[in-house]
Amino acid sequence: SKVRSIDFFTASAVTLLPFENFALSSNQQKNQLPNQSVTSQKDQQPLRIGFISATSVGGMDLSERFYESFKKNPKQGRLREVISHDCGASTELIASYLGINDFITTISTACSSAANAIMLGARLIKHGQLDAVIVGGTDALCRFTLNGFNSLMILDKIHCRPFDRSRTGLNLGEGAGYLVLQSESSLQRAPYCELSGYANTNEAYHQTGSSPEGDGAFLSMSEAIVSSGISPEDIDYINVHGTGTPGNDASEGMALRRIFGEHVPPFSSVKAFIGHTLGASEGIEAVYSVLSIDKGLIYPNLNFTDAMPETGLIPETSFQEGIPIRHVLSS
């Protein structure tokens, strides 16, 4: 189907809120999310601050912009200059704007990009390399990306329906989401919560598809729970990946059944609100997870009507407030 032209936008200023899978806890221990940024340690030594940003399709707009000149003259068109996409340009610009230079890197691992950024930041703090790290991701859309996903035949022409029997695909979105991870020794204010565990895996089933048994999701979620030092029964809410594609939701649902059996905690996908924001998705959904603990929120899984026959799982369909939530698993 034809995709209409999209206007590009430039953000002149950003507000930073203070993976494969990670678990968040209300306890205060090692890697923490502060209420505001901290510029110095208690002993007045400068903080070692890093910036780890994720993207999945960063730089693809260059190919789109250069294509017209290439089409007019293939021998001189600027598309010949594009050897590779510089997906780290936004990372360097944001770090420069914020004055961060201790550690800067970009991660691009498709839709797990921001989750891996969060995990790397936590590890750098754990091993004493940094005191604080801004972690998350950002992605913006262009026709190149939209048509690429359209060629995969996984776009839904109407609102996506995560975990619904009638789901046929995803809706793309764009945006950014970041957290500030900080070591306990450098904290000057009470944190929102603790990043208590994390894990990623590679099931090597297929280049773009998940195993029907949910092996990858099962392993990463299980290991994240073990890493956090809690048991599956301690999870109060799950922010699932829930793209709305037939393959992902069936695979992820099988993983949930394997871990929790008949006692799957309340879960939902926020992608029906924000779309699949690609490399930014796990950063944005980490913010949702933090707010879930801080404010006692459970988000509704929009557009759900009928359970998938593969698992019979029913997500939360109403917005809930004031719920005592100690541990959130984000997939």
Segments the model singles out, each with a brief description of its role:
Residues S1-N31, N35-S53, G59-M60, S220-P232, ...:
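Conserved active-site "lid/cap" helical segment
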Residues V3-D7, E81-G88, T105-S113, G169-N171, ...:
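Active-site nucleophile and cofactor-binding loops and adjacent substrate-binding regions
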Residues V14, P18-F19, C87, A95-L98, ...:
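Active-site-proximal alpha-helical scaffold in enzymes
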Residues D43-P46, D234, G312-S331:
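Flexible, low-complexity linker/loop segments at domain and module junctions
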Residues T55-T105, N248-E262:
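Active-site-proximal gating segment of KS-fold condensing enzymes and close homologs
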Residues F70-R80, S96-I107, D156-D164, T201-N202, ...:
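Glycine/charged-rich beta-loop-alpha catalytic/anionic-binding loops adjacent to active sites
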Residues Q129-S151, D156-R167, Y198-P212, V240-D249, ...:
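Acyl-CoA/ACP chain-elongation machinery
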Residues H159-S228, Y237, P324-R326:
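Condensing-enzyme catalytic core mediating Claisen C-C bond formation in acyl metabolism
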